[in-house]
């Protein structure tokens, strides 16, 4: 449904309105809402990782990192020939940010190393299947770009980021704040089944 809605809106703006060239231009207006939404999703997943010290929270670490990388990707490079002003990040700093984020992710994995084997069990990994929908939307968006449909590409990307943000809010509701030492933290998975 998201695929059809996003593609339909993108196609309509692209083919039926005079604003497509401006709206979908490199560093155009659509880039900023995308960056904001994916940034919010990354923050929520990072908070979920802090709130849940178990496998659920451990899964949120790489997800937050990948979403943060998406923010860097959405921000224009200052050296780009398409850059025409506004906020930007130099390519060298993009590399620094991605590398630093990767290092933080590895530290998080090290601190949660006791969860690494548990997190790959279907009981935990299947919780995050909705992100596969966002990934599918991004793949179709890339196909749209290759065929010259920038409107479809950008709106599918936007749909993917909105979907990821909504899912991050759901995950937030399945986690609880860290409990004092000596008390086990309980979180929830679909259908209200509690798991430790």
Give the positions of each predicted feature.
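Membrane-proximal helix-loop-helix units in multi-pass membrane proteins
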Residues: 64, 68-121
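Terminal transmembrane helical module of multi-pass membrane proteins
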Residues: 117-122, 126-178, 182-192
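Juxtamembrane "helix-exit" motif on the non-cytosolic side of transmembrane helices
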Residues: 12-22, 75-84, 113-115, 140-148
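Alpha-helical transmembrane segments of integral membrane proteins, especially early/N-terminal helices
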Residues: 1-2, 52-68, 161
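Alpha-helical transmembrane segments of polytopic membrane proteins
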Residues: 26-39, 90-102, 153-162
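Alpha-helical transmembrane segments
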Residues: 1-11, 64, 131-136
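Membrane-interface helix-boundary motifs at transmembrane edges
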Residues: 47-59, 113-125
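Short juxtamembrane and helix-loop transition motifs at transmembrane-helix boundaries
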Residues: 18-27, 58-62, 84-87, 119-120, ...
